């Protein structure tokens, strides 16, 4: 057993996975969480946004050896089912390759599986209802308040890692040292928020919509999406602006909400008899992006996951990026060693920040794509060409596929290469390029891919 004690703040998805991997390496791990043990309490409605598990996240689960267990809790989604306003629904495949899909999984179910795995390690101690109030960064000390007793406790570790989410207390302690650390921080909210509703199963426990698709009802400045759950239900999420006649701040009566759905989503009403009650009972959540740098302080303290790089959910990569943090951190321990935490932390932040900044930007891009463009003629033609190319030439990957199905390619390269590919494809779709055969088109795209592979 190694002597170093690792204190991890935040027993969410990435924090618990990190604790497991550090315990596997023989470290003493103390894992602190401000909430109750979710295995012993009922989860509140309206905050559960389903997660999309893809290969980057699966590689993280492999570290804990629980990929098979989690996949049993997943429903594969092979593409988007688009429901235009007043038009016929149509399907857009995520990939032209056989078997590629993203997986709808419950955040709570996944977190519980990770907590159960963590509990099996004698060298992991878990403390719930402990809120971090502040940290002494250079000493690896964190101060906690017990939410039920009010007692305070000081905890010292050889290193201190914050996986405590977008409102990270550890990050706030780093911000208090802005001048010393040259700490840069930005937080940008969309003018939209989200609210969750639900589609319940049929009386027989079946699905009312195609279960193997992510459903989107795009309506210009707002949209609804729905993801399947194992029990036959769908988690339905409204993404709306706060302001404007159909904004969350202005639809304040049952009559207004009912009239709005009758106008924009009449086909959903039969599936959701309680939608008005859910609209008023469930909270409205904000959608924001957090970027910061550096992620480490004094070689004793490190940020990881949403604490370092919270993103909006529109690429389905928030959890996957955080699990990738854990994987890269473990790979660096293998290559660099753990004798020099400061050097390890520095290399980790250098490798990860450029990539998490990229997926943050891509997630914003995808918000506008899902809301405004999924039923646009040029976009639909581009997607048709992409999936046809992927079917015929499996070595070609669209921007979406580079991000989602190629964990060997960093997010930054996927973003730059994918944008360059999109530019070429959209030019072809709009007639800005001479007509090409499929093989000529593939050859040009592969030349482009080679340039990015070589770092050009």
Where is each model-derived feature located?
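Glycine-rich FAD pyrophosphate-binding loop
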Residues: 23-46
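Conserved hydrophobic helix-helix packing surfaces used for dimerization/oligomerization
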Residues: 6-8, 29, 301
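Beta1/beta-strand and adjacent pyrophosphate-binding region of the FAD-binding site
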Residues: 2-14
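C-terminal helical "tail/cap" subdomain of flavin- and related membrane-associated enzymes
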Residues: 2, 331-456
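Conserved mid-domain beta->alpha element of the FAD-binding
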Residues: 11-20, 24, 162, 197, ...
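Conserved N-terminal helical subregion
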Residues: 2-5, 54-196
